[in-house]
A protein has these predicted regions:
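Generic hydrophobic, amphipathic alpha-helix propensity
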Residues: 14-23, 39, 65-69, 73, ...
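N-terminal intrinsically disordered/low-complexity leader segments
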Residues: 1-13
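Hydrophobic/aromatic-rich alpha-helical bundle segments in the mid-to-C-terminal region
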Residues: 109-114, 144-191, 199
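Helix-turn-helix
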Residues: 25, 29-60, 64
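Hydrophobic alpha-helical connector segments
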Residues: 64, 78-104, 157-161
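Short secondary-structure transition hinges
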Residues: 99, 103-137
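Hydrophobic core segments within long, regular secondary-structure runs in both alpha-
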Residues: 95, 99, 133, 137, ...
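Amphipathic alpha-helical packing segments from all-alpha helical-bundle domains
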Residues: 71-74, 78, 121-146, 155-159, ...
Length: 199
C-alpha cells in the first residue's frame, strides 16, 4: 500500500512538472511552435512517450492547463466574494490578486491574457463564458444594484473595467512597463474604478 502511495505521488509530481514546463513553453514559443519532445526535455523525461502516461495529446495537455488556471481563478474569486460584501471591495481584492499573480504566477496570467486558446482549444469555453468571468459579472451586478457602479450592461462595465486592468497587466508582463507591478497597481485601480463608478 505504501508503495502505491509513493507511485501515485511520483505520478502527480511528474504530471505537475509536465504541465509547468508546457505552460512555460506555450507562453514563450506559442502552442503550435512547441513540440511534445520539447516539453518532455524541459520536464527531464527520458522519453517523449512518457507524456502519454498522463495526457492523450498535446491538445489535452493544453486543455488541462487552461481549465486548471480557470478553476484556480474561480476558487480565488469565490474566496474574495465571501470575504468582502461591497462590489468595490470585491473588485479591489480581485485587482490585488491579479497584480500579485504578475509576480507569483506570471506564466499562468500570460496564458490567460495573451495566448489565444480558441485557436488550439476550440471545444473549450471562451474565457468570457467561464464560471470565473460569470462571478466577476456578479460582482459588477452587485455594484449596480447597490448604486456603487453605473447602471449599464454588466458585460459593458466588465469591458471598461478589465480593459484597463488587463491592458496594464499585459504591459507589465511583456516588459513595456518595466518597474515592479505594485508601482502601477493603484493607478490602474483608480483609472478602472473611475471608469465604472457611479458619480
Amino acid at each position: 500500500m505504501e508503495q502505491e502511495k509513493i507511485l501515485i505521488q511520483k505520478k502527480n509530481e511528474t504530471e505537475d512538472e509536465i504541465l509547468r514546463c508546457a505552460l512555460s513553453l506555450f507562453v514563450s514559443k506559442g502552442y503550435f511552435n512547441t513540440s511534445l519532445s520539447e516539453i518532455a526535455q524541459a520536464a527531464q523525461l527520458t522519453k517523449t512517450q512518457e507524456i502519454y502516461d498522463y495526457f492523450e495529446s498535446k491538445q489535452q495537455l493544453a486543455a488541462t492547463l487552461y481549465n486548471s488556471i480557470i478553476d484556480s481563478l474561480s476558487v480565488s474569486i469565490d474566496e474574495i466574494r465571501r470575504r468582502n460584501k461591497k462590489a468595490s471591495e470585491q473588485l479591489h481584492s480581485l485587482v490585488n490578486l491579479l497584480f500579485k499573480l504578475t509576480e507569483e504566477a506570471p506564466n499562468a496570467l500570460r496564458f490567460l491574457l495573451t495566448v489565444n486558446a480558441t485557436e488550439f482549444l476550440p471545444q473549450e469555453k471562451l474565457f468570457l463564458q467561464t464560471p470565473a468571468v460569470n462571478k466577476m459579472l456578479k460582482m459588477i451586478q452587485l455594484g449596480i444594484n447597490n448604486g456603487e457602479i453605473r447602471s449599464l450592461s454588466p458585460m459593458l462595465i466588465y469591458g471598461y473595467f478589465f480593459g484597463i486592468i488587463n491592458t496594464t497587466l499585459e504591459l507589465i508582463l511583456n516588459g513595456t512597463l518595466d518597474k515592479k507591478s505594485e508601482l502601477y497597481q493603484s493607478q490602474a485601480w483608480l483609472a478602472a474604478w473611475n471608469a465604472i463608478a457611479k458619480k
